[in-house]
Amino acid sequence: MKIVIINGSARKGNILTAINAFMKGAADRNAIEVIQPDKLHISPCKGCGVCQCHKGCVDNDDTNPTIDKIAAADMILFATPVYWWGMSAQLKQVIDKCYCRGMQLKGKKAGVIVAGGSPVDNIQYELIRKQFECMAGYLSWDMLFQKSYYATAR
């Protein structure tokens, strides 16, 4: 299975630790690629809709090559720290740009890893979980897991 991991954290902290643990368990049976949005040049989606008449985003940046990788994957793993009760801006920007080819993402397997500075019964995790459940329902994803971590230490 081809797995794409979108690392929504620019830091080498708890999210990277969780990604590495996932990769350790999955690497011998799968092809895994990690996308680091903070290392890419991806402009914010302008909502222009031109992408609906073309074969992808018209911005001359890293959007189309990034979405190509996501569209080619069998599974997408979204990994994010909690930023103000939501996913990180880095991850959200990649998700927003998926609009240009959204229906090509139908029927995939998905997973979510979230790390925050509050206990896992805090509403912040529920808010993020609901966002991914809505995306999964819309795109007919098989949501394999959603795991939240109280990131008190690595």
Where are the regions that the model predicts?
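N-terminal beta1-alpha1-beta2 submodule of the flavodoxin-like/Rossmannoid cofactor-binding fold
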Residues: 1-101, 137-151
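Short, glycine-/small-residue-rich phosphate/pyrophosphate-handling segment
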Residues: 105-145
